[in-house]
Design a protein with these regions (language model features):
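A conserved regulatory-domain signal marking ACT and ACT-like small-molecule sensing domains
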Residues: 311, 316-428
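Substrate-binding/catalytic subdomain of NAD(P)-dependent oxidoreductase enzymes
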Residues: 180-278, 283-285
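General beta-strand structural signal in soluble alpha/beta enzymes
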Residues: 61-62, 78, 103-105, 128-132, ...
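Glycine-rich phosphate/pyrophosphate-binding beta-alpha loops
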Residues: 294-296, 300-306
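Rossmann-like NAD(P)H-binding beta-loop-alpha module
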Residues: 122-203, 210
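N-terminal glycine-/serine-/threonine-rich beta1-alpha1-beta2 phosphate-ribose binding loop
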Residues: 1-98
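Rossmann-fold NAD(P)-binding glycine/threonine-rich loop
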Residues: 83-98, 107-145
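A short hydrophobic/small-residue beta-strand
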Residues: 101-103, 376
Length: 428
């Protein structure tokens, strides 16, 4: 058995404390499975006195994470402080330049700087690993870089933000409006400090960008991910979707087309009987479609102390075993800079708006759609007691750019009393 692998951890929040607990409680198990002992050597966090529910006795404390990253007595630097810039970025760069392996759960940083950090890791012949950055305890990164390495990936699809899935599930099961469930989720601590990272689809978009890079051999480009949040989803949308046999999910889809790499994260209607449609509460699900493997479905908790710290430990054990895999599954220099493209796959759409309750208004809306070559599959008008008539239209398949032109034309008419909300109906 070789010499101990020495670890330094920056960040002792929920995940960092969870990693310390696993290292303390499972030391013999880790040694037997990795072939060498793993020793937690040094730590760093904002508060030294805070009770984290685990003993920190015997550990060296660094008040400066940059100093921790450069210490000569650690082999692996674990970054768990977050943020898409410094000090996390500087600390990771310091560790890599010092010849240390790096493990991070920082999806925002990877989505923004992943390419340059991967190149730096390769230059210094060390590993940059991030299983915990995508979907918590689900081994999505390992599935792509290892288990499916012999496959051409046709499509990635999934629910990658548990908070949004919780909100949408709660709205449906409790018949509560978005604002009420949002406030409830905030009180439960489900939301990021900036809630729009969750509800705006940004957090999930970061994860999709990372997986896309691995699956399609491309440089990470988060700006190319079309993101739309769940803020405009109403209880009426939830009810209408249910009546038609659908559920609404914040759905990520990435696929290579003839035009380029298509990446989108947006609320969609999916079949209630599909695996994604049956996903409840704060769970995540990621589906990889490989040309030989077929459809691989991974489901599990996407956040929380246990699942995320488990993912960090997976990376630690990989390093202890000497497993060396390029950061994004292949040499960073071989990753292609792809032209981003808008969605080129046609789909049916759900449209909800309010129209003036007067003769001829539905005909005007149908004309605006027809002028753009969009046919109507069904139209629903709910009962109302005021001058505004709530209307739901489901179209036949069309391209999003065509739909957008039609929506602009609809808005220019004198019959709409609110901006239409359009949700894609995705075949899953």
């Amino acid at each position: 058995m070789g010499s101990a692998l020495k670890i330094g951890i920056a960040g002792l929040g929920t995940v960092g404390a969870g990693v310390v607990k696993i290292l303390r409680s499972h030391s013999r198990l880790i040694t037997s499975r990795s072939g060498k002992s793993v020793e937690l050597k040094a730590i760093s966090a904002r508060s030294r006195s805070k009770d984290r529910g685990v003993s920190l006795e015997g550990l060296s404390w660094e008040s400066d994470i940059i100093e921790l990253a450069g210490r000569s007595d650690i082999d692996v630097f674990v970054e768990l402080i977050g943020g898409d810039g410094n000090p996390a970025k500087e600390a990771i760069e310091t560790a890599l330049k010092s010849g240390k392996h790096v493990i991070t759960a920082n999806k925002a940083l990877l989505a923004k700087h992943g390419q340059e950090l991967a190149e730096l890791a390769e230059k210094n012949n060390v590993s940059l690993k991030f299983e915990a950055a995508v979907a918590g305890g689900i081994p999505a990164v390992k599935a792509l870089t290892e288990s499916l390495a012999g496959n051409k990936i046709n499509r990635i699809m999934g629910v990658m933000n548990g908070t949004c899935n919780y909100i949408l599930t709660r709205m449906e099961t409790s018949n509560l409006p978005y604002e009420t469930v949002f406030n409830e989720a905030q009180k439960l601590g489900y939301l990021e400090a900036d809630p729009t990272l969750d509800t705006g689809g940004i957090d999930a978009g970061h994860k999709l960008a990372i997986l896309s890079s691995i699956a399609f051999g491309t440089q990470i480009d988060f700006k190319a991910v079309v993101t739309q949040g769940i803020e405009l989803v109403s209880i009426q949308d939830i009810e209408q979707a249910r009546e038609m046999g659908y559920r609404i999910k914040l759905l990520g889809v990435s696929q290579m087309t003839d035009e380029g790499l298509e990446q989108r994260m947006q609320p969609c209607l999916v079949s209630a009987n599909s695996p994604i449609g049956q996903l409840e509460n704060a769970m995540n699900m990621i589906i990889f479609d490989g040309d030989h493997s077929g459809q691989i479905i991974l489901r599990g908790a996407g956040a929380g102390e246990g699942p995320t710290s488990s993912a960090v430990m997976s990376d630690i054990i990989d390093i202890a075993r000497g497993n060396k895999i390029p950061t994004f599954g292949q040499s960073a220099n071989s990753l292609i800079k792809m032209k981003p493209v808008l969605t080129s796959t046609p789909a049916a759409y759900y449209i909800r708006t309010k129209l003036e309750d007067s003769p001829g208004v539905l005909a005007k809306m149908a004309t605006a759609l027809g002028n753009n070559g969009i046919s109507i599959d069904q139209m629903r008008q709910t009962q109302h007691a005021d001058v505004a008539a709530p209307v739901v239209i489901v179209t036949h398949k069309t391209l999003p750019e065509t739909l957008n032109k039609a929506l602009i034309e609809i808005m220019k008419t004198d019959v709409t009393l609110e901006a239409p909300v359009a949700l894609r109906i995705e075949d899953v």
